[in-house]
Curated annotation (Swiss-Prot):
It comes from the Bacteria. Keywords: Cell shape, Cell wall biogenesis/degradation, Magnesium, Metal-binding, Peptidoglycan synthesis, Transferase. Substrate binds at G41, N42, R43, R44, W45, S86, T87, E88, R92, R211, R217, L218, S219. Generates Z-farnesyl diphosphate (Z-FPP) from isopentenyl pyrophosphate (IPP). Z-FPP is the precursor of decaprenyl diphosphate, which has a central role in the biosynthesis of the mycobacterial cell wall. The active site is at D40, N89. This is Short-chain Z-isoprenyl diphosphate synthase. The keyword Cell wall biogenesis/degradation applies. It catalyses: isopentenyl diphosphate + (2E)-geranyl diphosphate = (2Z,6E)-farnesyl diphosphate + diphosphate. Binds 2 magnesium ions per subunit. Mg(2+) binds at D40, E230. Its cofactor is Mg(2+). It comes from Mycobacterium bovis (strain ATCC BAA-935 / AF2122/97). Pathway: Phospholipid metabolism; decaprenyl phosphate biosynthesis.
Amino acid sequence: MEIIPPRLKEPLYRLYELRLRQGLAASKSDLPRHIAVLCDGNRRWARSAGYDDVSYGYRMGAAKIAEMLRWCHEAGIELATVYLLSTENLQRDPDELAALIEIITDVVEEICAPANHWSVRTVGDLGLIGEEPARRLRGAVESTPEVASFHVNVAVGYGGRREIVDAVRALLSKELANGATAEELVDAVTVEGISENLYTSGQPDPDLVIRTSGEQRLSGFLLWQSAYSEMWFTEAHWPAFRHVDFLRALRDYSARHRRYGR
């Protein structure tokens, strides 16, 4: 049974949204600089909505990504990292995967549109998604400015363990190129050295990690960088993620006392 009459839902939603905005405006200094988002639940949303073709869920989820990034920009967030395609996702049915990669390529090109004035960077191995999609993604990202008020990382062909391995390999390769001895190579493997060779090198670690669809795990997302991140989970599937959900995540983050493992 409906507790709230349908005609009142929209006004009450807008009122709640306004109150959340006002509360966040009063605590702007407590907002995260970097938000990382696992956009989970596209297929489940499609099935629960009665669609046999799960690619419809991906398309609706893609539209939500650009919308969510605008929320971040409007809120004053400096950097957002969005998990679009993991290395594990590459094992899906070939037809489903091809549709997903096409949708991801389209949404990244939308994110990179000049009208947004966002600086966009890919994190992951584009060599895993095929030559043509990789070419389109590189072209789109290279067209964005290096200096901007809002930066976006799109994680495509990304695996957290793979990133750490790649960082260590890059670190050791640089040391070898400089003629390092075996002992010097061992000494070179430090927290700072690995951090400097991650895909996100030069960027702050995420302050807040958001995951939709009720799953409460990282699934390999930014394993190194999220060691001290705050986590926020919601039952909503990604296509159904609302602005008030986003504002609630920011509100909850601003109320937390970060301990950084201490």
